[in-house]
């Protein structure tokens, strides 16, 4: 007697009988990009299992599991076997459920998978560099289990417009007053001009508008740079010709312009001018060894920190150490790179470390103005993140990574050597490596953030993070940060990554 279940579905059978045999779960998803499914994976599985998108249209899987063998056996490769072709998907539904639902790995595999390919389903793209060779647990469990958590963190980190305007208004009053008074008084800094830099002006500030960076730039014509011990980043500054009456001659140590002397006088003038400000509660913070900034503390009533950085502006060619830096040709374009390198470069009084002390005559190259341009024009498409263009999650990943490091530093003094510039440098390299806007789709925020974590962990493991503008200057060298600190940070990031970022719950 013909099975009545087969008669009810006979009019819809058009699939070839070659699709009958059930298959094992496909591993094509293991090779998918972390920012979206791989398009080829579905079509290859369809050749063996039938089009999985048709499964919901088939009759409900009412066949008892005990009937699976009987139905498969009854089905014959015949042109009239229409009913058998439609009944068979019900036999395979339990297997397909494990394949199609990435949220149920425990159903498919109660133990950690022995096949290394299978693990890639939850940890990101297989071709990325990262902490894969560290022996640490691999799966970005936080990103996988709580995809909305990162978005909630970003919402809390978003600055309120009211707070921004109030803080910016107060800072601008203080900075403009200092700038005017310095330009009016007869001193070596009469020609200074303002240049806004830092995370606030790059629109990547997090939590609260309580930190600002402002450059007071001073043009110095016809200077000659002497690289300090082949660092590529630190230089001795000399004048090719010192005009008679040049006020900067007061800061010379022989032929070399002393960064320490110049910063000391700059600091003295700012302290004098701050004392004249009566309507705002502002003071000058104690000097920090090796810091190029004069830090102001404004109470508004909340405390606002303002770093005023003296910078020498040179309109000459960029130093030879930067020739291979700024590798944006395949991302923002060769023309943009050429134009950026035609802009002036800057030197700040950040001294090179010499053992346990600092070399007081040295200056360090600064590219804050170029970094600001990149962050505000980060898309391969000119309209990226504009009101009329598609959005990306580049800056969101940067904010999350900055916040993660910031919170870890608050808890562990072993991380004092690390700073947000390390995060910024790492993500510049990631944007260069993955230049397409589609690779930073906001819908894939968790996997994009995990890519950044993996890259940063690999930099810590290999102790190598090249300066984005000066490739031979390694920001993670043993001379700058000891190995123990890098291993400590790596373990803390791995813990957060594999446990759903519990540190974010403290926000």
UniProtKB/Swiss-Prot annotation:
ATP binds at residues 199, 371, 402, 420-424. The enzyme activity is strongly increased by double-stranded DNA (dsDNA), but not by single-stranded DNA or RNA. DNA-binding induces the formation of liquid-like droplets in which CGAS is activated. Liquid-like droplets also create a selective environment that restricts entry of negative regulators, such as TREX1 or BANF1/BAF, allowing sensing of DNA. A number of mechanisms exist to restrict its activity toward self-DNA. The modification 5-glutamyl glutamate is found at residue 302. It holds the Pfam family Mab-21. The modification N6-methyllysine is found at residue 491. Residues 7-18, 121-131 have a biased composition (Basic residues). This is Cyclic GMP-AMP synthase. Changing residue 386 to A: Abolished homodimerization and subsequent activation. Does not affect nuclear localization and tethering to chromatin. The N-terminal disordered part (1-146) is phosphorylated by AURKB during the G2-M transition, blocking CGAS liquid phase separation and preventing activation. Phosphorylation at Tyr-201 by BLK promotes cytosolic retention. Localizes into the nucleus following dephosphorylation at Tyr-201. Phosphorylation at Ser-420 activates the nucleotidyltransferase activity. Dephosphorylation at Ser-420 by PPP6C impairs its ability to bind GTP, thereby inactivating it. Phosphorylation at Thr-52 and Ser-199 by PRKDC inhibits its cyclic GMP-AMP synthase activity by impairing homodimerization and activation. Ubiquitinated at Lys-402 via 'Lys-48'-linked polyubiquitin chains, leading to its SQSTM1-mediated autophagic degradation. Interaction with TRIM14 promotes recruitment of USP14, leading to deubiquitinate Lys-402 and stabilize CGAS. Ubiquitinated at Lys-372 by RNF185 via 'Lys-27'-linked polyubiquitination, promoting CGAS cyclic GMP-AMP synthase activity. Monoubiquitination at Lys-335 by TRIM56 promotes oligomerization and subsequent activation. Monoubiquitination by TRIM41 promotes CGAS activation. Residues 48-59 are annotated as: Required for association with the cell membrane. Its main location: nucleus. Binds 1 Mg(2+) per subunit. Is also active with Mn(2+). Mn(2+)-activated enzyme forms an inverted pppGp(2'-5')A intermediate, suggesting a non-canonical but accelerated 2',3'-cGAMP cyclization without substrate flip-over. Mn(2+) ions are coordinated by triphosphate moiety of the inverted substrate, independent of the catalytic triad residues. Undergoes a liquid-like phase transition after binding to DNA, which is dependent on zinc. A lipid is attached at residues 392-393, 459 (S-palmitoyl cysteine). The modification Phosphotyrosine is found at residue 201. Signal peptide: none annotated. Gene3D superfamilies: 1.10.1410.40, 3.30.460.90. Monomer in the absence of DNA. Homodimer in presence of dsDNA: forms a 2:2 dimer with two enzymes binding to two DNA molecules. Interacts with nucleosomes; interaction is mainly mediated via histones H2A and H2B and inactivates the nucleotidyltransferase activity by blocking DNA-binding and subsequent activation. Interacts with PQBP1 (via WW domain). Interacts with TRIM14; this interaction recruits USP14, leading to deubiquitinate and stabilize CGAS and promote type I interferon production. Interacts with ZCCHC3; promoting sensing of dsDNA by CGAS. It catalyses: GTP + ATP = 2',3'-cGAMP + 2 diphosphate; GTP + ATP = pppGp(2'-5')A + diphosphate; pppGp(2'-5')A = 2',3'-cGAMP + diphosphate. Changing residue 222 to E: Impaired tethering to chromatin, leading to constitutive activation in the absence of DNA.
